[in-house]
Amino acid sequence: MNQVELLSPAGNLKKLKIALNYGADAVYGGVSHFSLRNRAGKEFTLETFKEGIDYAHALDKKVYATINGFPFNSQLKLLEEHLYKMAELEPDAFIIAAPGVIKLASKIAPHIPVHLSTQANVLNTLDAQVFYDLGVKRIVCARELSLNDAVEIKKALPDLELEIFVHGSMCFAFSGRCLISALQKGRVPNRGSCANDCRFDYEYYVKNPDNGVMMRLVEEEGVGTHIFNAKDLNLSGHIAEILSSNAISALKIEGRTKSSYYAAQTTRIYRLAVDDFYHNTLKPSFYASELNTLKNRGFTDGYLMRRPFERLDTQNHQTAISEGDFQVNGEITEDGRFFACKFTTTTNTAYEIIAPKNAAITPIVNDIGKIYTFEKRSYLVLYKILLENNTELETIHSGNVNLVRLPAPLPAFSFLRTQVRV
């Protein structure tokens, strides 16, 4: 049995490093233009993407470059220039959706494998065969694909790798093919600037044909109903079925625009789940409780195990987002000596430490605070909040940009958190 690859989102260089340190075998990300994540100033530049690739390769891990937008004719020259620039960075694969872009990429950089984006909506063996004949090495399956169908595709095309999403946001539309945002905001999802209009609350009205009066059809508390809002995908409870099928080469986590803690926690838990499967020690209830520490829209196992018409639990009509069970109070700096405050933090309060895979945490007590272990979990208590500039406080809020000293160094990219609900 081949070990499955765990693939995590990398929205920027920091998240790339976090995901790799928390156990990802590979990460995916892109540089504006055609990567379906155009967030000015918040994503990679060519320089930082190259730095990320070099960082990953030094760890013997991989980086896949997303070039999965659907270009218009007016963009083809820019696309070609972009492909040449991305090829020079030497990513481990291109993730592409459009057949024409696949052919162009294969011409420009025949040595770089092509992975087919989920945006291509592959659901059957016939479509998979077409893209395989185009030279595609791996298909990122449509979220609507069932595991049984994935097994059939693998049987027909044993040399074709299949990748599935196991966690993250889901579109109301068919694998992201949506124009709601384009129509309402002028922001085109398939060019990387979706405004997430499906997450808004809407009100139903009916029009009286006799007098034109508009009447509200559904009465709800608040301002409306989230009629388009899909729950978040969570397949942590189905790792055994997925890996036992021997059809899946990679498990993918969605979320390039989500928080650093999200990148860390999802990678941490799915890394643990995959490793536990191979050691026959699966703990699905633990994975579920830990993933609930993240903000989410409610969870569903999507369509991999059951068809859409067999279920009525993929939508959340009540709210577009809910808080997780835990609040992140601090992010440890890369040198491990300080943390950046992300939420109100006080003295004499125990904060759980979430650290990268295999990171060592040494207990200590001094005048700043203590680091200790209790029931296999590590905690930090601050006796005083001492800023980098030596200012002393009893409480610090997220608006304070000064770094806070730790009693002793903690592993880079660790997090401090507290439980906010049971």
UniProtKB/Swiss-Prot annotation:
Enzyme class: hydrolase
GO molecular function: peptidase activity
Disulfide bonds: none
Transmembrane domains' residue ranges: none
A Pfam family hit: Peptidase_U32
Signal sequence, renumbered to the chain: 1-58
Keywords, ordered alphabetically: Hydrolase, Protease, Signal, tRNA processing
Keyword Hydrolase found: yes
Keyword Ribosomal protein belongs to the record: no
Family, per entry: Belongs to the peptidase U32 family.
Record's function text: Involved in prephenate-dependent formation of 5-hydroxyuridine (ho5U) modification at position 34 in tRNAs, the first step in 5-carboxymethoxyuridine (cmo5U) biosynthesis.
Protein name: tRNA hydroxylation protein P
Organism: Helicobacter pylori (strain J99 / ATCC 700824)
Gene it is expressed from: trhP
